[in-house]
């Protein structure tokens, strides 16, 4: 018989309380125990003399008191967008950086990126602010400003050395994500983009739980044409549906290559099962568009420059503009207001 994974008692409780765990007791619960999750745990008369008293008294109980604080901090953020993909290496962080630069081309729009890829933060490098450090004031942490209307917050800014590994378990990751939402002075933003790691792990559960009170507009899925990528994106779509996160659409990255010499398009990563468009139709979600491969995107990210400013007429830039306009429609916005024509 094949092994099976243990199913949680309530999936809804997993989404609602991603970091609330039953304390690890050192002895069985006595007959008159009020319960380790009770508000009186460790304090009731029946707790006297119990080996678990100190453990139960220090365990978190009830609703997270920081949720209202987060909602108040983000009350002036108009749109909160998650960028997700079940698969690593599909260009999700690259997509986030391109999307931020696209939104920021409108000088009237203020944009923020929150990098929740705790163990592999690459957004600072792509935005050209890798060597910056966070300033802490009496009112909170100041994000790093890439330009007048584009800010970034990442764990990379908190590391003593650029190459330091972040070897953290879930609770520490969750705590930092909460700080990014609760303590960072995001100010008035039109768009807050949340770059996430691959999969459906602690980071995703925490972001969803912490932002429930202030509202998430939805998630953008990023994939490449291969079925290996699509398999994991299906799981990510299922995660969003179970978590109650609206799926704003799916974008296919690295979709073909347009030769700069002859303009002929080649399918380097040819779709074997229909690619992103077919998956969007299968899962009944909007298809935002396809962005072709362009080595200059990699170059712009390596040098921390805006691909939109450097290569505005390239096939990939024009395709990405279409993705942005389709996303604007899903947000209920006028595409001309989000990405004005020159």
From Swiss-Prot:
Alphabetized SUPFAM superfamilies for the sequence: P-loop containing nucleoside triphosphate hydrolases
Needed co-factor(s): [4Fe-4S] cluster
Pfam family, one: ParA
PROSITE patterns registered for this protein in UniProt: MRP
Binding site for [4Fe-4S] cluster 2: 259, 262
Subcellular localization: Cytoplasm
GO molecular function: 4 iron, 4 sulfur cluster binding; ATP binding; ATP-dependent FeS chaperone activity; metal ion binding
GO biological process: iron-sulfur cluster assembly
Xref: InterPro entries: Mrp-like_CS, Mrp/NBP35_ATP-bd, NUBP1/Nbp35, P-loop_NTPase, YlxH/NBP35
Gene3D superfamilies: P-loop containing nucleotide triphosphate hydrolases (3.40.50.300)
Residues given in the record as [4Fe-4S] cluster 1 binding sites: 33, 47, 50, 56
Cofactor note: Binds 4 [4Fe-4S] clusters per heterotetramer. Contains two stable clusters in the N-termini of NBP35 and two labile, bridging clusters between subunits of the NBP35-CFD1 heterotetramer.
KW Oxidoreductase (keyword) present: no
Record-level GO cellular component terms: cytosol
UniProt entry keywords in alphabetical sequence: 4Fe-4S, ATP-binding, Cytoplasm, Iron, Iron-sulfur, Metal-binding, Nucleotide-binding
Binding positions (ATP): 86-93
PANTHER family on file: CYTOSOLIC FE-S CLUSTER ASSEMBLY FACTOR NUBP1, NUCLEOTIDE-BINDING PROTEIN NBP35 YEAST -RELATED
Purpose of the protein: Component of the cytosolic iron-sulfur (Fe/S) protein assembly (CIA) machinery. Required for maturation of extramitochondrial Fe-S proteins. The NBP35-CFD1 heterotetramer forms a Fe-S scaffold complex, mediating the de novo assembly of an Fe-S cluster and its transfer to target apoproteins.
Quaternary organization: Heterotetramer of 2 NBP35 and 2 CFD1 chains.
Protein family according to the UniProt entry: Belongs to the Mrp/NBP35 ATP-binding proteins family. NUBP1/NBP35 subfamily.
Protein name as catalogued: Cytosolic Fe-S cluster assembly factor NBP35
Lineage of source species: Eukaryota, Fungi, Dikarya, Ascomycota, Pezizomycotina
């Amino acid at each position: 018989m094949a092994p099976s994974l243990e199913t949680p008692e309530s999936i809804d409780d997993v989404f609602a309380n991603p970091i609330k765990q039953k304390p690890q007791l050192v002895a069985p619960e006595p007959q008159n125990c009020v319960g380790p999750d009770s508000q009186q745990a460790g304090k009731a008369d029946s707790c006297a003399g119990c080996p678990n008293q100190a453990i139960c008294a220090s365990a978190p109980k009830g609703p997270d008191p920081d949720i209202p604080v987060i909602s108040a901090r983000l009350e002036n953020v108009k749109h909160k967008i998650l960028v997700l993909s079940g698969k690593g290496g599909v260009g999700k962080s690259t997509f986030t950086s391109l999307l931020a630069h696209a939104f920021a081309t409108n000088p009237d729009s203020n944009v923020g990126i929150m990098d929740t890829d705790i163990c592999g933060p690459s957004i600072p490098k792509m935005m050209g602010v890798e060597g910056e450090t966070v300033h802490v004031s009496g009112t909170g942490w100041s994000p790093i400003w890439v330009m007048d209307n584009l800010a970034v917050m990442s764990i990379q800014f908190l590391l003593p050395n650029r190459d330091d590994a972040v070897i953290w378990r879930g609770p520490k990751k969750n705590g930092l994500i909460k700080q990014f939402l609760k303590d960072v002075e995001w100010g008035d933003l039109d768009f807050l983009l949340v770059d996430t790691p691959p999969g459906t792990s602690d980071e995703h559960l925490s972001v969803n739980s912490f932002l429930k009170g202030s509202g998430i507009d939805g998630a953008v899925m990023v994939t490449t044409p291969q079925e290996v990528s699509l398999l994991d994106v299906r799981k990510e779509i299922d995660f969003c549906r179970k978590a109650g996160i609206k799926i704003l659409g799916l974008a296919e990255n690295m979709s073909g290559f347009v030769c700069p010499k002859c303009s002929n398009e080649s399918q380097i990563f040819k779709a074997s099962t229909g690619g992103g468009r077919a998956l969007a139709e299968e899962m009944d979600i909007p298809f935002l568009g396809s962005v072709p491969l362009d080595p200059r995107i990699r170059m712009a990210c390596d040098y921390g420059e805006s691909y939109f400013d450097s290569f505005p007429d390239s096939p990939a830039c024009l395709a990405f503009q279409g993705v942005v306009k389709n996303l604007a429609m899903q947000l209920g916005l006028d595409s001309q207001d989000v990405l004005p024509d020159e």
